[in-house]
């Protein structure tokens, strides 16, 4: 099967309208950001004019997709890809009036409290968000009742004990940041900051992952072999959708800059 054919899928009708060459040229990670954005957006009530933070947007293809498909205003925020690079891509896509690129660290964001109507994180949350204190920090930027959603590479179930043999050649230390939907749901709910509405694994998750890698990195034999041998036992795509609780109390001294001046009792 040609790579172009792999990027056209009945599962993702909106994404399939984008030219495969554009999708591949703007890939910035190990997942098809359009597929994951479409999957996540199907569980969100996105409406024209909403202010959306696309956190860890990479080359901003997810931000362009959100603007084109839903008419939202998007703050395309990333640390590893410059705003100068992303603005050119945004202009080329004809969405400069509604997508605003920003170079920023997810742990030091320059936004006002309650500025956004939604936050989405596409295949990026595991890089910065699994710290026990991070949700308290991130939630301040969305309005009470607004959604925080993630869709990313993850685990079908947590790995207990030793790493399975078939994953060892591919696995690196940073992959321990991958978690299951159930783990993320528990991690968020225990804070009382959000109400988790949805936490699940993508159906045929490993096959979608495999299709993408055959298209974008067919020479990556190590990862392709790991996905094939795993067969959906451990690795796949997950999504979690939550809403900030209106009554939730956020701790101002919790993260990140204010750690230096925390409460005296600590």
Language-model segments: residues:
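Short, glycine-/aromatic-enriched active-site segment of Class I SAM-dependent methyltransferases
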Residues: 20, 153-175
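Conserved alpha-helix/loop element of class I SAM-dependent methyltransferases that forms part
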Residues: 31-48
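Class I SAM-dependent methyltransferase SAM/SAH-binding core
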Residues: 53, 59-108
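A short acidic, Gly/Pro-enriched loop at the edge of an enzyme's catalytic core
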Residues: 107-119
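A short SAM/SAH-binding and catalytic strip from SAM-dependent methyltransferases
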Residues: 118-130
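A short glycine-rich, Lys/Arg-flanked "PGG" loop and its adjoining helix->strand segment in the class I
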Residues: 132-147
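Short alpha-helix
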Residues: 176-192
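Conserved Class I S-adenosyl-L-methionine
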Residues: 197-266
């Amino acid at each position: 099967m040609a790579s172009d054919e792999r990027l056209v899928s009945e599962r993702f009708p909106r994404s399939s309208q984008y030219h495969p060459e554009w999708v591949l040229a703007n890939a910035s990670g190990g997942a098809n950001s359009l597929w994951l954005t479409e999957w996540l957006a199907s569980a969100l009530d996105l409406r024209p004019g909403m202010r959306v933070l696309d956190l860890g947007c990479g080359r901003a293809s997810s931000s362009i997709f959100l603007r084109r498909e839903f008419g939202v205003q998007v703050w395309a925020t990333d640390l590893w890809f410059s705003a100068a690079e992303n603005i050119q891509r945004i202009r080329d896509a004809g969405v400069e009036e509604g997508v605003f690129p920003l170079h920023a660290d997810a742990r030091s964001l320059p936004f006002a409290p309650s500025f956004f109507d939604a936050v989405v994180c596409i295949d990026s949350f595991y890089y910065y968000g699994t710290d026990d204190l991070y949700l308290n920090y991130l939630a301040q930027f969305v309005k009470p009742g607004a959604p925080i959603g993630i869709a990313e590479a993850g685990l079908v179930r947590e790995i207990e004990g030793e790493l399975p043999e078939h994953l060892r050649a591919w696995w690196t230390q940073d992959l321990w940041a991958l978690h299951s939907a159930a783990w993320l749901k528990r991690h968020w709910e225990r804070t009382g900051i959000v109400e988790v509405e949805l936490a699940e694994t993508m159906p045929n998750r490993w096959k979608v992952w495999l299709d993408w890698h055959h298209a974008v990195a067919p020479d990556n034999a190590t990862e392709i072999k790991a996905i094939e041998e795993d067969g959906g036992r451990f690795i796949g795509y997950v999504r979690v959708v939550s809403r900030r609780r209106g009554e939730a109390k956020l701790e101002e001294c919790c993260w990140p800059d204010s750690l230096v001046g925390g409460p005296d009792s600590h």
